[in-house]
Amino acid sequence: MTKLLLIILDGVPYRNWRRLFGNLEGWVERGEAQVRRMRAVLPSTSASCYASIHTGLPPQVHRIWDNAGIRRLEFPDVFSELTKAGKVTGAVTHSYWSEFFNRAPFDVVRDIEYDEPEGPITHGRFHTMHGYGHANQMTPADYDLFGTLTRLCEIKGIDYGILHTCTLDSMGHRFFHDCEEMDHACYAMDGTLAPFLHRWRQNGYEVIVTADHGQDARGHHGGTGEDQRDFAFYYFGNSGLPPEDQVLDQLALAPSILTRMGVAVPPTMQAAPFFTR
C-alpha cells in the first residue's frame, strides 16, 4: 500500500528550486528522485492554488478568486476521497486548508488542533499567521512543522499527509528573489528539510516536494509570468513520470495522488493523472 506525503513550500519559483536546493538536487543527481516543471493555475494566487491542488478544479470552477472569501468548498477533494476509502489523513498547514476541506470559519480554539476519526482531515495541526505584515511575517519555524508532520506519521500512522509552509513566499514578498536573503533562506530550508525527508523515506513514505506557485523578481505572483506560475516538482517514489520536457499541470496533482494511493478519482477531477505506474 502506497503512503504519500505532499510538502508544499509556498512561493518558490522554478529557477530558485533548481539552483539553491542542493540536497533535493543531489538526490536527483543520484537517481533517488525525479524532478519536473509544474505550472500553476490562473490566477497564480495562493488560496486559488490551494483549492486547485486538492480539488483538481480551476479557480473559474471552484470560485476562489483571491485570498479573500475563504469558505468550505463543496467539491470532492483529496482528503474527502481518501477518507471515504478508509485512509488516515493528516495536515500540518495554514488554516485556509482546514477551512477549504473541513469546516469554516476557522475557530482558533476548536480548530488549531484536532483528531477526528470521521475526517475528512483525520489529524489536523494548523497555524493562522494572524497579524501578518511586511515587518513580521508571523510564520512558524519550519523545523517545528516538519517535526509535527513526522509525529503524525509515526504516532498517528497517517497514510497521506500534507505540509504547507509560507516562509519562503513571505520572505520573497519582503526581500524579492534576486538577493542574498533569499539565497540563504532557500539554502536553509533545503538543509532543514533534508533529514526529515530521509526519515520519511525510511518510514516507507513516497514524498512530493513542490510549491503552489512561483514568484517573479519583484516578489509578485497571481498573473501569467513564467516566474509567477512555474515551480519544481520533486518526486521520491517508484512511479514513472512524463518526459522531462513535459510541463506538469497543477490540476493533475489531485487525481495523480489518488491514483497513486489506489483510490478512485471522482468525475470532477478531469485532468489525466501523470504518474505512469
Model-predicted regions and their roles:
Residues 1-277:
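Feature captures the catalytic ectodomains and active-site-proximal regions of enzymes
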